[in-house]
């Protein structure tokens, strides 16, 4: 059995056409089904529907053989028990700092609100800056508006939500896209099969994004 972990939303919508190129098509529509384990047209391939932030955990610990996760999630997760063999070049966005338009630099320690705590710690440590990091799970844009934080670190797509709340994108931390990840043990045990899938997906990606 080959198990692939995916999260609902943009990544799922963009991944399914790529999997179809490899002959893997879910029997039920994952967006409409309440099931979290979705069978596919191949009897020995199934999809697991999990939270985006949990995809690396399922893959690293062997509950899934493969998965698709955003680079932002992988940067925050930082696990060592998985391979990242392929950039699928889907769900593209940017991980950036943002703050109030025209705001002056704070006199004391910078306060940064984000759900990407590990990324934030590494980013500011590399700059030699001491900051107070505030963990939030959503509505990041609110933090600078109510004085909770001076800046935020978040994923930025169009930037419209930032601008609508009087914020502006500032420093680029990373360019983000979704990656195929593979459990290390699975890669050894099912090498030929997984490598064939990787090669097929790579060809599908390259046909969409010719050099």
From Swiss-Prot:
* Subcellular location(s) per record: Cytoplasm
The protein's matches in InterPro entries, at most eight in alphabetical order, are given as:
ATP_PRibTrfase_cat (IPR013820), ATP_PRibTrfase_CS (IPR018198), ATP_PRibTrfase_HisG (IPR001348), ATP_PRibTrfase_HisG_short (IPR024893)
- Pfam families noted in UniProt: HisG (PF01634)
The record's Gene Ontology cellular component field reads: cytoplasm
Q: Which UniProt keywords apply?
A: Amino-acid biosynthesis, ATP-binding, Cytoplasm, Glycosyltransferase, Histidine biosynthesis, Nucleotide-binding, Transferase
What reaction does this enzyme carry out catalytically?
A: 1-(5-phospho-beta-D-ribosyl)-ATP + diphosphate = 5-phospho-alpha-D-ribose 1-diphosphate + ATP
Q: Indicate the enzyme's highest-level EC class.
A: transferase
Question: What would you give as a GO molecular function for this chain, any one?
Answer: ATP binding
Q: What is its EC number?
A: 2.4.2.17
- GO terms for biological process, alphabetical: L-histidine biosynthetic process
Question: Pathway it acts in?
Answer: Amino-acid biosynthesis; L-histidine biosynthesis; L-histidine from 5-phospho-alpha-D-ribose 1-diphosphate: step 1/9
Q: What is known of its domains?
A: Lacks the C-terminal regulatory region which is replaced by HisZ.
SUBUNIT field: Heteromultimer composed of HisG and HisZ subunits.
Q: Which family does the UniProt entry place this protein in?
A: Belongs to the ATP phosphoribosyltransferase family. Short subfamily.
Question: What role is this protein assigned?
Answer: Catalyzes the condensation of ATP and 5-phosphoribose 1-diphosphate to form N'-(5'-phosphoribosyl)-ATP (PR-ATP). Has a crucial role in the pathway because the rate of histidine biosynthesis seems to be controlled primarily by regulation of HisG enzymatic activity.
PANTHER family of this UniProt entry?
ATP PHOSPHORIBOSYLTRANSFERASE (PTHR21403:SF8), ATP PHOSPHORIBOSYLTRANSFERASE ATP-PRTASE (PTHR21403)
Name this polypeptide is given: ATP phosphoribosyltransferase
